Amino acid sequence: MRLLILERDHALYAALLMAADPSLKVVAGDDPLQLIDAASECSIWLGQPDLVAQMLRQGVHPVWVQSTWAGITPLLAADLPKDYSLTRAVGIFGQVMSEYLLTYMLAHERQFLGRLASQVGSQWDSRTPGGLRGRQVVIVGTGEIGQAVAHTLSGFGMDLTGVAKNPRSLVPFNRMGSLDDLGRLVETADYLINLLPDTPDTHDIYDRALFARLKPTALFINAGR
């Protein structure tokens, strides 16, 4: 089996795949223009969507593309072919995204940047830090990643509101709402977290009018696409 890897971390992916199956014939790189001939001989491609899109525009068609990203927006462009199987990376980003968001939330509550500046300037910082318990969090996007984030934040005693296109009861959210409810739900939020993908349906959800409804002290974290 011949496999094409189009990834900036192609060496790592190639090493892992070869260790798992030494019989694989792997062609790997991060410059589509240098791999056109090799790509035409590979029916299976593994790679990041922006590089895969460049290869598709060269007229080379795979049978199956496995994206290394959760998002596949570059592959949805109107000028690209759609006559192949496309799968994306799922089930691996929940922990990473939870840690990413928690880092910013703790830094915000503990006023980390201001305290660091005081420390560098050899100044005593007497500000009282905040905490996460009881904070109102609105998470927009309650798929696999959103649920993983909610489970992490629930351990800190935060009050969680989930927003989805088709809301349904989900643990550990305290309540659920639809996108039509978003304007009302953000009014009491201490944190507004976006986890939505970049699709035509998600354009212009966050606008001046929505942000005007947030409390002055609220923090918006965009971890979506």
Segment roles from a protein language model:
Residues 1-44, 157:
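N-terminal glycine-/charge-rich "phosphate-binding" loop or analogous flexible N-terminal tail
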Residues 167-225:
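Rossmann-like adenosine-cofactor binding region
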Residues 83, 133-136, 217:
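Phosphate-coordination loops involved in phosphoryl transfer and adenosine-cofactor binding
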Residues 115-148:
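Glycine-rich NAD(P)-binding loop of Rossmann-like domains
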Residues 6-7, 48, 68, 195-198, ...:
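Short, well-ordered coil/turn residues at beta-beta hairpins
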